[in-house]
Amino acid sequence: MPIVIVEGDLLEAETEYIVQQNCCTAMRPHGLSQIIAARWPHIDPYSFKTRLTGNWSTIESRPVPGSIALYENECGPNVICAFAQYIHGKPGRYVDPAGTKIPDTAVARFQYFKQCLTVIAGLEPTSVGFPYRIGCGLAGGNWDDYFGAITEWSAAHPEIHVVIYKI
């Protein structure tokens, strides 16, 4: 099934799931995750973490890059949080005060994103909505790469209806 690109609000999507990209280290939501958490407070993958310092969580409370968190939502589409970047911000902008050496380059983030897509396919969704330029705003990714990965993933899973929302 071909990817559909629509002008519209991702939070009003009629897909079974919507996907947002999240980082593993932050304590607070930013960008789209902040908008989602404001609308649906129970959908905040940062709220369960333990603070290390400032906006940094402890190593023990961080999700693994390439993993997802699934939030069921009675008030809208279910939300998939794709942990496709380790450190918040653009690659190389911050140094982890916990001293971890987990790769967080643009290349590593793109690989984490593709790992998340593989995990999402395992959910056997009927339809998935993505924000236009996922991974490319605050995270600094390249849309041509990310769109290419979504296109390839969609072609490999024709049973999944994929919609990209230009917010």
Predicted region positions:
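Macrodomain-like recognition of ADP-ribose-binding/processing modules
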Residues: M1-I167
